Amino acid sequence: MQTIIRVEKLAKTFNQHQALHAVALNIHHGEMVALLGPSGSGKSTLLRHLSGLITGDKSAGSHIELLGRTVQREGRLARDIRKSRANTGYIFQQFNLVNRLSVLENVLIGALGSTPFWRTCFSWFTREQKQRALQALTRVGMVHFAHQRVSTLSGGQQQRVAIARALMQQAKVILADEPIASLDPESARIVMDTLRDINQNDGITVVVTLHQVDYALRYCERIVALRQGHVFYDGSSQQFDNERFDHLYRSINRIEENAKAA
């Protein structure tokens, strides 16, 4: 099975606090993987390293690859990082869309990487590109909002627009950081259904950080759980039982309660 993401010996320190400890991880083509863990466990930090938004410590042997290309090595971004980013769609808790633009215009932004520079300066997109953008919006159930300003949409609708933009980008990997954290249950379900649909039907590899364990168990076949910057569990969601849940979350809560009491 093709390895899409490879992480070796990744460490990260913030203000003398070790957020990640020599993390090693392989993610394969077509997987939908949930990153779980308590607040401060390092799951969002790990995801941001995969995207090249932040760099790790300058540790010997640390290395991140995405689609066979180096993202960063020993604390330095690869010179051709843009080539990795061109194949990666990003979805964040804070909706990273342009509020003053329409839904369709936001989705067309996904085509910028494959559009000649002079066209991007004037936002000149071809008829074929606009048709593909409408098809992407149809996939996520948002085509009827195509000419509406993004700022008028609900949180769940904005997340679906972000997914449509990743489809427009023809991303091979989607990295989603807490995409349902601020959504109501019905909107969260729709967003997760959409991610699973493109994973299963388009073969797009999806890595998603979640606080909601029930969504991880329902939608993701594999769980990678982090605890205090270490990989605590990496395996099937079916084997992530109550005992592992207790060790991952409740023991951390007891440590925090004891610290407050002291």
From Swiss-Prot:
It is a peripheral membrane protein. Keywords: ATP-binding, Cell inner membrane, Cell membrane, Membrane, Nucleotide-binding, Phosphonate transport, Translocase, Transport. It comes from the Bacteria. Coiled coil: none annotated. The keyword Cytoplasm does not apply. PROSITE patterns: ABC_TRANSPORTER_1, ABC_TRANSPORTER_2, PHNC. It catalyses: phosphonate(out) + ATP + H2O = phosphonate(in) + ADP + phosphate + H(+). SUPFAM superfamilies: P-loop containing nucleoside triphosphate hydrolases. It is found in: Cell inner membrane. Residues 5-253 form the ABC transporter domain. InterPro entries: AAA+_ATPase, ABC_transporter-like_ATP-bd, ABC_transporter-like_CS, ABC_transpr_PhnC, MetN_ABC_transporter-like, P-loop_NTPase. One of its GO terms (molecular function) is ATP hydrolysis activity. It holds the Pfam family ABC_tran. GO terms for cellular component: plasma membrane. Its EC number is 7.3.2.2. ATP binds at residues 37-44. Part of the ABC transporter complex PhnCDE involved in phosphonates import. Responsible for energy coupling to the transport system. Belongs to the ABC transporter superfamily. Phosphonates importer (TC 3.A.1.9.1) family. NCBIfam families: ABC_phnC, PRK09984.1. The complex is composed of two ATP-binding proteins (PhnC), two transmembrane proteins (PhnE) and a solute-binding protein (PhnD). This is Phosphonates import ATP-binding protein PhnC.
